[in-house]
Amino acid sequence: MKKLCILWALLGCGVAYDAACAQGVSSVWYDQDTLLERDFTQRIRAVSNNKVFSAFSVPMADDVRKCMMFLYAYMPLPDLTDYSGVYYRENVTYSLKARREMPWGKSVPDREFMHFVLPVRVNNENLDESRRIFYNELKNRVQHLSMYDAVLEVNHWCHEKVTYQPSDARTSSPLASVKTAYGRCGEESTLLVAALRAVGIPARQVYTPRWAHTDDNHAWVEAWVDGKWYFLGACEPEPVLNKAWFNSSASRGMMMHTKVFGRYDGPEQVLGRTPCYTEINVTSHYAPVSDVQVKVVNKKGAPVPGARVQFKVYNYAEFYTLASLQADSTGQVRLSLGRGDIMVWADHQGTFGFSKVSVGKDSDVRVVLDKTSDWSGGLDIDIVPPRQSGNLPKVSEEQEDANKKRLAYEDSVRNAYVATFPDHESQRQFALHLQQDTALVCRLLTASRGNYATLQRFMSENIGTTSASRWILPLLGVLTDKDLRDVSSDVLQDHLLHTPSCPKDMPDDIYARYVLNPRVDNEMLTPYKAFFVQVLSKEKTAYYQSHPDEWAVWCRKNVAIDSVWNPQVLCMHPESVWELRKTDEHSRKIFFVSVARSLGIAARIDPVTGEAQYWKQGVWYGAGLEHVNASSSSEGATLVKAGYKSVKYLEDPKYYTHFTLSKIVNGVPVLLNYPENATWSSLLKDGVSLSSGQYLLVTGVRLADGGVLSRMQIFKVPEKKQKMRISLKMRETQGKVEVIGNLNAESLYGDLSSRSSKSILSTAGRGFYVLGIVAPNTEPTNHAIRDLKACRRDLEKWGRKIILLFPSEQAYEQNIRKEEFSHLPSTVVCGVELNHEIRESLAKDLHLNSELQLPVFVIADSFNRVVYFSQGYTIGLGEQLLKVIGQLE
């Protein structure tokens, strides 16, 4: 440790730390100090910027210095440049404080502390001050509890603050989620991990990148308690650990993983190592697993060392990569996975091959790289997901009742906070006072949630007081709802006051969306325009405005690509890119667009292809910043039309639900990200423009049991401009629907209108009906209800009753008027379960060996026959119901 002072002294004195200096210092300690010291030294060499490491120029205690070294040795490049040493030192101070003051602090080993308590970052969220704030709020609440009970208590605290609500892919910071009072699963789990770490409890976010049995993904939390890792649903407290709504779903998972900060040497299988994190496989914590060994060979049967091997699961109508490994010197890789079907796709130097693998049956797999960019063809693939397994921990009725009471109280705490947001009338009065569009102002303030004061202050201070006043509402109007919930006053002021005026030849909507707009992609918004107005001369600004292609040339020549130190592809602030002149490819594109907009040039990242582009005289031009070009449209593109022969209840297949299109670039499929509402009729019926190259069309029909009838079609788009036709084929299930169980149609439920018991038969009449048992305020039920609403028209056309049973009349009254339960099909009838009799009957008659996971949905008839059953987390429920209904007729 003493000899490290040589290095820190050099940094503190501002001595240039070049490679020769590093070699001189490192040679002194390599034989006696740790990997951490070596990695820290290598990091200094890689960055070659004294300013970044200025935090080490001030005196620190040894434990603080070691923790700071650990963070700086492994943090991704954007975290190194975008946040100050003072910020990290405060986080280190509070981490050590929690370790000293919390009763379990001394029992946490160094490995678990360094990797699962100390790191600030959880996922790809914006970093904030939550470590200090959460510690001060939680310490008295948990310090007299056992470590096990403290984990449960912290989750109850999180539930007081946040409940589930889906949103876009950008991850809110923990404090932003608290301010908003809701978040998606990735944000809820980020919040819980941050809160647990704040009180010194090791925690990590666990992801299934994609489920195997339904179209979605999920994130939750594992907490280390007295030597063992336990899991829990974030902001969804249960009476005990290792119990969550996703127990059954996780038992059907193909892959669950987590990324551990730094060089981790724990007992779990390592999926990959980068300079910043170690990715580990935790699938065996949740599901039965088997090993698969894949050998990659060329056409002649010789091993292909270094080949990339991707393990892909069917989800959202594409084969999504769960894990990517590199073949060893014998051309082999090994991976532990859940026992279901998976696609193995291997490539090397432009050649590729693929094979479906049934994990648990196929232990040794051979993939031949026998395809090139000229290959075309198609095949049908039947996908079978893992079977449900596992048991829930036992919970007494008293524990359940006590937990339900706590949840109700926590809902009231959160709802009391939400009630402080301005109501519609106060929003309307505010808009009238400013003499602005009432409907637009009300929409903006509603969307901003707990950030409403920021928007009100911004509008009040600027409307009528600046020449840019006319652009205030357009500026707010182009922001996403999530942006409105966490945007700062500084950002709004910067982009209003420092964006160049709209040119006369530029339409207002182009100016608002692609010049004024602070949002480029998925980055955290910053007030960067004033910075670039200052650092770029008027002469340079005028030149680039006239020659935007030259700004693209400057970026290519002057901003180097670092493909090593940002493996998570976090977004670096544009100002930091300017200062360092080095970043990853994605951040360079954001930088190009951000500075272009600061210059008054309309620019964007194409939402379909990911290509950085600038606008000139009504045409979008590529900036040429992409290392791998997956552009789907360009000058001279081919108009590709797809014919489709409709199947029953599927007149217009949906992108991401029934089909996707990828461009195969250097042997690897790259998904084309068309809008979420794209369909066959809007995209392929009349044709989509595709640049020349090789493409992969995937279609799939999700079955009621989670299986998939999929088809892969690889085709070539020629170089010469012309039209071509392909076929969009949706496979159909063969045979009639089978009876899978029984449900007595005379079973009773509580009728809410008459306040008496009523039979299913008396409500549904003769024939088929849908019955659902729901659990309001849970993510699986919220998804199911949204799916029913999405299929409202077709379900109403069917005309049969849909009976939704709530756990109690109180639960019905508290939830039926909420937004998520609005606009349901007119055929829906709501009631109350009576003593769990219906669910117990279903479990018995369907021979289920574990407790039912809500929500439960069945299609049954008046002859007591059940032909469809689903439980727990299911995406696409409405589509599944309609698929079965179509077969019934």
Where are the regions that the model predicts?
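Bacterial Sec-dependent N-terminal signal peptides
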Residues: 1-24
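Structural micro-motif
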Residues: 218-220, 825-828, 843-858
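Beta-rich nucleic-acid/ligand-interaction surfaces
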Residues: 175-180, 209-224, 573-580, 610-619
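Surface-exposed loop and adjacent secondary-structure segments within mature catalytic domains
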Residues: 237-240
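Cysteine-centered nucleophilic/redox motifs
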Residues: 154, 181-206, 221, 551, ...
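Short, solvent-exposed loop/turn segments at conserved positions within beta-propeller repeat blades
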Residues: 213-215, 654, 851-852
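N-terminal accessory/pre-domain segments preceding catalytic cores
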Residues: 22-151, 155, 198, 225-230, ...
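Short, conserved helix/loop micro-motifs enriched in His/Cys and acidic residues
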Residues: 127-139, 158-190, 528-531, 556-584
